[in-house]
From Swiss-Prot:
This is DNA-directed RNA polymerase subunit omega. HAMAP family: RNApol_bact_RpoZ (MF_00366). Disulfide bonds: none annotated. One of its GO terms (biological process) is DNA-templated transcription. Promotes RNA polymerase assembly. Latches the N- and C-terminal regions of the beta' subunit thereby facilitating its interaction with the beta and alpha subunits. It holds the Pfam family RNA_pol_Rpb6. Its EC number is 2.7.7.6. Keywords: DNA-directed RNA polymerase, Nucleotidyltransferase, Transcription, Transferase. Transmembrane segments: none annotated. GO terms for cellular component: DNA-directed RNA polymerase complex. One of its GO terms (molecular function) is DNA-directed RNA polymerase activity.
Amino acid sequence: MARVTVEDCIDKVENRFELVLLASHRARLVSQGAPITVDRDNDKNPVVALREIADETLSPGDLKEDLIHSLQKHVEVDEPEPDPASLVQTEAAPAFAEAAEEEDQPEALTFDRMSEEELLAGIEGLVPPEKSDDY
């Protein structure tokens, strides 16, 4: 990579380690088919990503948010706050719920009991799954 390109980017992204993360993420996006915002000039994807950051055709903040979002396994969704009127109704609801529970008691659930020998016999009787080429 051209040193000039990296030095141009340091003005836009202060931390060089963060610059590497952002440029590598953008290079992966380009390799996956994301549109390029600068002329390619026969450069490879990491150089194109650095040039995009240096030319400020991409916001480093937006790129950072996109990187964080791509690394998250569980995305939290902001849910709207409940209005106070619904909170008053939910506070009164337990009193009504107790009365309704007394009237509509379902039968207790029962589970079959199994001895250890029966469990081991059942496990031994299992057929192993067919092998596949997935692993």
